[in-house]
Curated annotation (Swiss-Prot):
<feature type="binding site" description="in other chain">
    <location>
        <position position="128"/>
    </location>
    <ligand>
        <name>IMP</name>
    </ligand>
</feature>
<keyword id="KW-0436">Ligase</keyword>
<feature type="binding site" description="in other chain">
    <location>
        <position position="238"/>
    </location>
    <ligand>
        <name>IMP</name>
    </ligand>
</feature>
<comment type="pathway">
    <text>Purine metabolism; AMP biosynthesis via de novo pathway; AMP from IMP: step 1/2.</text>
</comment>
<feature type="binding site" description="in other chain">
    <location>
        <begin position="13"/>
        <end position="16"/>
    </location>
    <ligand>
        <name>IMP</name>
    </ligand>
</feature>
<dbReference type="GO" id="GO:0044208">
    <property type="term" value="P:'de novo' AMP biosynthetic process"/>
</dbReference>
<keyword id="KW-0460">Magnesium</keyword>
<comment type="function">
    <text>Plays an important role in the de novo pathway of purine nucleotide biosynthesis. Catalyzes the first committed step in the biosynthesis of AMP from IMP.</text>
</comment>
<dbReference type="InterPro" id="IPR042110">
    <property type="entry name" value="Adenylosuccinate_synth_dom2"/>
</dbReference>
<protein>
    <recommendedName>
        <fullName>Adenylosuccinate synthetase</fullName>
        <ecNumber>6.3.4.4</ecNumber>
    </recommendedName>
</protein>
<comment type="similarity">
    <text>Belongs to the adenylosuccinate synthetase family.</text>
</comment>
<dbReference type="GO" id="GO:0000287">
    <property type="term" value="F:magnesium ion binding"/>
</dbReference>
<feature type="binding site" description="in other chain">
    <location>
        <position position="302"/>
    </location>
    <ligand>
        <name>IMP</name>
    </ligand>
</feature>
<feature type="binding site">
    <location>
        <position position="40"/>
    </location>
    <ligand>
        <name>Mg(2+)</name>
    </ligand>
</feature>
<feature type="binding site">
    <location>
        <position position="13"/>
    </location>
    <ligand>
        <name>Mg(2+)</name>
    </ligand>
</feature>
<feature type="binding site">
    <location>
        <begin position="298"/>
        <end position="304"/>
    </location>
    <ligand>
        <name>substrate</name>
    </ligand>
</feature>
<feature type="binding site">
    <location>
        <position position="142"/>
    </location>
    <ligand>
        <name>IMP</name>
    </ligand>
</feature>
Length: 428
């Protein structure tokens, strides 16, 4: 049975949670493979809306096993807050599996994230201040703390001491802050480890055995393609690999086990934080999209930057991820527009670029080249097949598919779980 990767094809907030939940009804395991609690996603079930930041969105489904892979950085405090919140609403979380090799976000990572961002001033990246970057930096610098380190007091103390040696020097001498106490930090982490222990497992082994047994595994990426530390709009990116390749390194499953790569794209584009955004709308059209689409961050509450659909970005996402399918979300938001622009290429210093510039200075200078499609007025939330959509809406979808270089296999037509038109199966 297949290993299916689900990733964001733009700058995040594309509706991956809803797409994951849709596909998740047909799979046995849902595994997050990157990021931390810096990305939020919402899952709507009936009249209930669940805002998740760290837990896989498949946690809502009692018939599958949710997994947090080794590529995720885990803030235990946030994890327990989410578990407690769900269990208070009757959602059982006891089937959650957390990789013993995942790295921990310690309190000092959050402190450093906030202090460093303020220190950068106008050069800030626009982080959420939740310690994600510093935790990944420790991982690369080989001074990180893994989940299994929380179960050995002496070993943990040594690792915390090693990690804080340089950080305390920076806090005191560079940022004029107090040093962080090693003993107190160790005690706090040991207590968190006690509660975390029942969920901890060798998740790489679990997922590989599941695939060997013919189970279907969905690999759920946080953030999105354009925020990938290698393939995104560097340096305005996250600290991990949300692209399809990250599913393998972030779970311990080999690339030959992946049979389908599904990208999620909004029918328009949004972005949170700093960085270039060629189709961004700074006028009333952008505010209209923001209000119609309720474009405010799940994690931070920040208003999202909004713009028209960027086909150059989607073609790039298709290439980088090897997309087999696209799930197009929030098509309903565009109802009421007389005309809908689509960015088909860029103008960079007078030259047309049909593909993504590798030079970020060129990308920052890119001006969108638009073609315009007629809009529609009808409410499409009750449409259950592609043929039921208004003719101009169908034409818009077909044009996006053509420009993206990948088939559109499902369409989101509203906020509810059943507001979806399935065109092609994403599992078979």
């Amino acid at each position: 049975m297949p290993g299916i990767v689900l990733i964001g094809a733009q700058w995040g907030d594309e509706g991956k949670g809803k797409a994951t939940d849709l596909i998740g009804t047909k799979v046995d395991y849902v595994a997050r493979f990157n990021g931390g609690n810096n990305a939020g996603h919402s899952v709507v079930v009936g009249d209930e809306s669940y805002a998740l930041h760290l837990l896989p969105s498949g946690i809502i489904n009692p018939n599958l096993t949710p997994v947090i892979g080794n590529g995720v950085v885990v803030d235990p405090e946030v994890l327990f807050e989410e578990i407690d919140g769900l269990e208070s609403r009757g959602i059982d979380c006891s089937h959650l599996k957390v990789s013993e090799a995942a790295h921990i976000i310690a309190p000092y990572h959050r402190t450093l994230d906030k202090v460093t961002e303020r220190f950068l001033g106008k050069h800030k990246i626009g982080t959420t201040g939740r310690g994600i970057g510093p935790a990944y930096a420790d991982k690369i610098n080989r001074v990180g703390i893994r989940v299994h380190d929380l179960f050995n007091a002496d070993h943990l103390h040594d690792k915390v001491e090693a990690s804080l040696h340089q950080k305390n020097q920076m806090l005191v001498k560079l940022y004029n802050r107090r040093p962080i106490d090693v003993d107190q930090t160790t005690e706090e982490l040991l207590k968190l480890g006690e509660r975390l222990k029942p969920y901890v497992a060798n998740t790489g082994l679990i997922l590989n055995k599941a695939l060997d047994e013919g189970k279907t595994v969905l690999f759920e990426g946080a953030q999105a393609t354009m925020l990938d530390v290698d393939h995104g709009t560097y340096p305005f990116v996250t600290s991990s690999n949300p692209t399809a390749g990250g599913a393998c390194t972030g779970t311990g499953v080999g690339p030959t086990r992946i049979t389908r790569v599904v990208g999620v794209s909004k029918a328009y584009v949004t972005r949170v934080g700093e960085g270039p955004f060629p189709t961004e709308l700074l006028d009333e059209s952008g505010e209209w999209l923001r209000q119609q689409g309720h474009e405010f961050g799940v994690t931070t509450g920040r208003p999202r930057r909004c713009g028209w659909f960027d086909a150059v970005v989607n073609r790039y996402a298709s290439q980088v991820n090897g997309l087999t399918d696209i799930v197009l979300t929030k098509l309903d938001v565009l109802a009421g527009l007389k005309e809908i622009p689509i960015c088909v290429a860029y103008d960079v210093d007078g030259e047309r670029h049909d593909d993504m510039p590798t030079d970020q200075a060129a990308f920052a200078a890119a001006k969108p080249i638009y073609e315009t499609m007629p809009g529609w007025d009808e409410d499409i939330s009750n449409c259950h097949s592609f043929d039921e959509l208004p003719a101009t809406c169908q034409a818009y979808v077909k044009r996006l598919e053509e420009l993206s270089g990948c088939r559109i296999s499902a369409i989101g037509t509203g906020p509810q779980r059943d507001h979806v038109i399935q065109i092609n199966s994403l599992v078979d």
